[in-house]
């Protein structure tokens, strides 16, 4: 596997093999990545009386979350210790022979802001907005603005195309085509559906 350079990223974008829509400024394309911007939708956990989240109970996980849409030029403030789901402004589409990783920009990390907890890997064939799992591990509240560059996507070629890429009918492609921050769909995992077997 090899990481795509800016030259190759531009070529793949021009050919339509990789889609990032929209790229409004050529400066988003970095030496080996593309900067992605923050969307305007956020989801955070409500304070509830339930002692814990259990993937085996019947509660809809969406009921644990509150949603907010931030107006243009207004900030979303994330406080120390808080966690929120957000989304990229851009829609991303990958071919069957490219994987991607989303990494936080170092400028955000130096403020104590992480862009993903564990879901930084994007399978070949994925299409949609990318859900970000944003945490503030710093000691100060931080303002985040829709349209702000907050993360970068890195592309890697595979040794061969996937036989069953993300979105294939035989795949567990729960987040295919997502258009905003999506809550966990862990209850749709085959091992949860089968009672942990």
Swiss-Prot record:
Enzyme class: hydrolase
Pfam families: DCD
GO function terms (MF aspect): dCTP deaminase (dUMP-forming) activity; dCTP deaminase activity; nucleotide binding
Residue numbers binding dCTP: 105-110, 123, 131-133, 152, 166, 174, 178
Active site: 133 (proton donor/acceptor)
InterPro entries, A to Z: dCTP_deaminase (IPR011962), dUTPase-like_sf (IPR036157), dUTPase_trimeric (IPR033704)
Catalytic activity: dCTP + 2 H2O = dUMP + NH4(+) + diphosphate
Pathway terms, separated by semicolons: Pyrimidine metabolism; dUMP biosynthesis; dUMP from dCTP: step 1/1
GO biological process per UniProt: dUMP biosynthetic process; dUTP biosynthetic process; nucleobase-containing small molecule interconversion
E.C. number(s) listed in UniProt: 3.5.4.30
Site (Important for bifunctional activity): 120-121
Keywords: Hydrolase, Nucleotide metabolism, Nucleotide-binding
Role: Bifunctional enzyme that catalyzes both the deamination of dCTP to dUTP and the hydrolysis of dUTP to dUMP without releasing the toxic dUTP intermediate.
Subunit text: Homotrimer.
UniProt similarity note: Belongs to the dCTP deaminase family.
Protein name according to UniProt: dCTP deaminase, dUMP-forming
